[in-house]
């Protein structure tokens, strides 16, 4: 196997997040044969992917002559790289995800990855931060299992004085996501970097940049 959760067969690569997406979208059992044919892989490869998902904490029911079925519990959400990737349908943003159960700061991590040459669109996500920061260096309380902490690294082709617009772009993205689960009239954006629900802050955004006078090396925009 190429790496845990991904197997090569006939030039195709099947990742466990793809299996997870297939099971989650299904209304009933999905047969092993259907998974084999859909991804062009062997039954052994499918079995290994299922076992990897179970190791990650997913409950998957298997029945002879029926296949596999994902047992989901809304009160026990699994927060992992696999879970995040299974929802991704973007072309560039978030196609390279770095996930930490615990880290100091996702912004610091994203800047380090940018310096190492990671591609634009790299997304750093953490379940807990021990050195989270807000604007003007203010501390940011970031316990595990309570919130979302993420930083997106981009290499935009624009002048440095335009980079601050990415803070608003992130705020709009968070706002639109929140509006999918909260009545739109309750949500808002408080300039320049907060998202609010019922006039209470639910998200702060911090944008940092490495640049020269005429060009940007990279920008990291963190949201928590």
Residue ranges and their predicted role:
Residues 3, 11, 125, 137-138, ...:
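C-terminal regulatory/effector modules of DNA-binding transcriptional regulators
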Residues 15-179:
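N-terminal lobe of the biotin/lipoate ligase/transferase fold
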């Amino acid at each position: 196997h190429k790496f845990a959760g991904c197997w090569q067969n006939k030039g195709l690569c099947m990742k466990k997040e793809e299996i997870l997406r297939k099971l989650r979208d299904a209304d009933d059992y999905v047969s092993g044969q259907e998974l084999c044919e859909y991804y062009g892989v062997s039954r052994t490869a499918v079995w290994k992917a299922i076992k990897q998902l179970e190791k990650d904490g997913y409950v998957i029911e298997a029945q002879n002559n029926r296949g596999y079925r994902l047992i989901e519990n809304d009160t026990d959400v699994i927060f992992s790289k696999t879970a995040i990737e299974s929802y991704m349908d973007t072309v560039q943003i978030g196609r390279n995800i770095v996930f930490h159960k615990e880290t100091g700061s996702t912004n610091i991590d994203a800047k380090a990855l940018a310096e190492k040459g990671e591609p634009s669109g790299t997304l750093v996500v953490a379940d807990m931060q021990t050195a989270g920061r807000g604007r003007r260096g203010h501390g940011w309380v970031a316990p595990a299992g309570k919130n979302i902490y993420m930083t997106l690294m981009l290499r935009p082709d624009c002048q440095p004085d335009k980079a601050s617009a990415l803070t608003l772009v992130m705020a709009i993205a968070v706002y639109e996501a929140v509006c999918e689960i909260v009545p739109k009239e309750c949500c808002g954006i408080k300039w320049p970097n907060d998202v609010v629900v019922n006039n209470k802050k639910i998200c702060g955004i911090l944008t940092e940049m490495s640049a020269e006078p005429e060009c940007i090396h990279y920008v990291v925009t963190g949201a928590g």
